[in-house]
Amino acid sequence: MEIPLPDWVLEAGKKDPDLFFTDQYGYRNPECISLWADNAATLAGRTPMNTYKDFMISFRNTFKAELGTTLTEIAVGCGPCGELRYPAYPENRFAQKASQWRFPGIGEFQCYDQRSLLSLSRAASEAGHIEWGGSGPHDTGGYNNLPFETGFFRYDGGSWDSEYGSFFLSWYSSELVNHGDRMLEMTKRVFDKRGVTLAIKCAGVHWWYNVRSHAAELTAGYFNTRAGEFVSERDGYAPIVRVCKKHGARLNFTCVEMHDSDHPWYCYCGPEGLLRQIRSACARFDVPFAGENALCRFDQAAYDKIIKNCAGEGNDEEMWREGTMLPPMACFTFLRFNAELFSPFAFESFRIFVQRMRDETGLLDTSIGNTSDEEASTEDVDEISSESRVQLGL
């Protein structure tokens, strides 16, 4: 389901186009408000942060009886699709002449509105290189380029691996982390002592994960690279996990059903390694990790992978704290129901999957209704979704 910004926000964007993220061609993406506008009084005298807070307070007051009982988690939307990232790979054409991103394109940096350029200019001045503050990198290609087609992202000698590249990527990723910090800080104040868990979600940008530059992750805001000549090996997700730890929040992530081999070899996809990296960071910082499936899949290979990932590895708590072995997930959400799932064969497979989740992962606290396995029905699955830590969603 796609829910656009309210009309009054879109109208404000006509008066202040820098309210939205902007790419190198000047195309503005109205999917969400730019993080650089967080504290700009551009919405009838109020800032976006003011309006986010007003919405949260209204939600809290409206559902105060359900908080801590029916409603136990507040997932804070921090960007496109509710994810803490830049809209570097827009799946919908947001301007008539704008390029339509397609997998496995590397995407584009989204830092060309006036507020972001002002922030970049200030950072460049502080770094002693005012010449770096005029714009983003000039050799990054377009939405659908591949890393080796660009000067910035190419495997060897790419300018991502330079003093300038390190500066720019550090600034770009830090601005994203700071936005997540602001959002969680505000949410924590609104919902303090209400019996709910806070959570944010990172995007599963797994394409080009297995190349040195991690190009698609960089444009999305995750400075996650292998070591180069100027750039050290970076864990681009640890800063986000630290923010979660600071605010007592859970980290939600996707790709739980994926194998690397599900994807074309030439895309250098690494969903398994990416998932492990983020789970390991959560384990080291003692941050609860919640997973979900990325795609609409009802096959046995996907079910087996979900169960394996949810169960974790071993039972050595010290190795869990070190991140060398992965603890069980705190929660799993099964997404993307459709009519296919409720066909007799597919639903029987799903019923068995839910039963295995109960028996093999410890994430289910309830049986499948009060019926025998042969009698389990769609109503019983609904009961599981409302009474357990495995969530079922659309």
In which residue ranges do the predicted regions lie?
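Polysaccharide-binding and catalytic clefts of secreted carbohydrate-active enzymes
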Residues: 5-242, 249
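Substrate-binding cleft of secreted/luminal carbohydrate-active enzymes
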Residues: 236-394
